[in-house]
């Protein structure tokens, strides 16, 4: 017996069957996938954490 995994679409809350028959998983549709992508692109969503200073060398050109 195969267990079917059902997840909620993170955008609209619709039940989505997790598998190859759901190509946009975890989203229910391409529309919900693109809405979510747009929110990330517009920086409405973010992963919490300290600011990334990896490309900063600790000085500003304005100091000199």
UniProtKB/Swiss-Prot annotation:
One of its GO terms (biological process) is regulation of DNA-templated transcription. Keywords: Metal-binding, Zinc. Residues 42-64 are annotated as: Disordered. Its cofactor is Zn(2+). Residues 54-64 have a biased composition (Acidic residues). GO terms for molecular function: DNA topoisomerase type II (double strand cut, ATP-hydrolyzing) inhibitor activity; zinc ion binding. It holds the Pfam family YacG. Binds 1 zinc ion. Disulfide bonds: none annotated. InterPro entries: DNA_gyrase_inhibitor_YacG, Znf_NHR/GATA. Zn(2+) binds at residues 9, 12, 28, 32. Belongs to the DNA gyrase inhibitor YacG family. Interacts with GyrB. This is DNA gyrase inhibitor YacG. It comes from Vibrio vulnificus (strain YJ016). The gene is yacG.
């Amino acid at each position: 017996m195969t267990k079917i995994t059902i997840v909620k679409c993170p955008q609209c809350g619709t039940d989505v069957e997790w598998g190859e028959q759901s190509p946009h998983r975890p989203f229910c549709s391409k529309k919900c996938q693109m809405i979510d992508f747009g929110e990330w692109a517009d920086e409405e969503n973010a992963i919490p954490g300290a600011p990334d200073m990896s490309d900063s060398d600790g000085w500003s050109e304005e100091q000199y």
